[in-house]
Regions:
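Proteins enriched for Cys/Gly/acidic motifs involved in redox and nucleic-acid/cofactor modification
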Residues: 1-160
């Protein structure tokens, strides 16, 4: 989705779409320009491949824009994404919903990912509108308290 010269590209679940709207609002409030923000998914290997493809495609299409990778894939493996030469910033799932993250983006470290299990407070951001969408979503939960052996989601989203 194209927003005020900052593109936000969401992969994966509806929660990412919801949070993408929060990121868009925070980007607008902080007058963030010339960025591509990729809200990633890590639920499957194929999802991560799509994220990596989009990173490279976005940089080819808009070489002057700075690339920010956030979302579950960034939360789970920030080193992997900061080591992709096209990526400028990697931001964790909790950090992407904090206004300070976006107001000081160029002044901070390139990797802003904290331990997702140490912070279990809910954010209090409200989505004012879903731009370019015919459906809206509400947030039911942010994480999961179960630890199914096959599931990576708690490590990307934290506890509920």
């Amino acid at each position: 989705m194209k927003k005020n010269n900052t593109d936000i590209i969401n992969f994966g679940c509806r929660l990412n779409i919801y949070e993408g709207e929060i990121i868009n609002s925070l980007a607008k409030k902080n007058n963030l320009k010339n960025y591509t923000i990729i809200n990633s998914c890590s639920v499957t290997e194929e999802a991560e491949k799509k994220v990596q493809y989009e990173i490279r495609k976005s940089k080819r299409k808009f070489p002057k824009k700075r690339i920010v990778v956030t979302g579950c894939a960034a939360q789970i493996n920030p080193e992997k994404y900061i080591n992709i030469k096209e990526v400028d910033f990697v931001i964790g799932n909790k950090e992407k919903l904090e206004k300070d993250t976006w107001s000081n983006l160029t002044k901070k470290n390139s990797v802003q990912v904290k331990n997702i299990f140490l912070d279990n407070k809910m954010h209090n951001n409200i989505v004012e509108k879903f731009e370019g969408k015919s459906r809206a979503f509400i947030e039911i939960q942010q994480g999961c308290d179960h630890r199914c052996t096959f599931c990576i989601i708690p490590f990307g989203r934290g506890n509920n």
